[in-house]
């Protein structure tokens, strides 16, 4: 994929790894290499849960229409907006005693309509999560409905993209009301989002 894009004038700009929880992957896909019984019987049959990757390409040159976030990032798409380390840092800096839920509620209530991007702590905390090279906060079940593989002969390649990934990328890389190209339809997640 990377070579194909590079051969057509694009440069790989970023790669994001989307972590997958092994038990949920096993349950959804029925892949045998994630079964615990093979650790006992023959661990050479075992493999890790494969992550998803988002590859971001850009062409050289100036972007004629900058993607702007005039108030910073205001919506978080994912499961865990505040990491434990973030809570401790915030509490020490502000002499508070919030837990993760209280801190997130405080940030949303205090900064949701905040216009100064430099002091908008909500935007800064969202960006800390998004700026990670591994997105471990994507809700694996936040997908459009599809039929799970249950029988041995079922198709095992149905992997709808999580809506958090789509929403996050559209928010990061497009302006409001822009038309976004989706090169494949799949189960329709991009169009739905």
Where are these regions (language model features)?
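Core catalytic lobe of class I
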Residues: 1-193
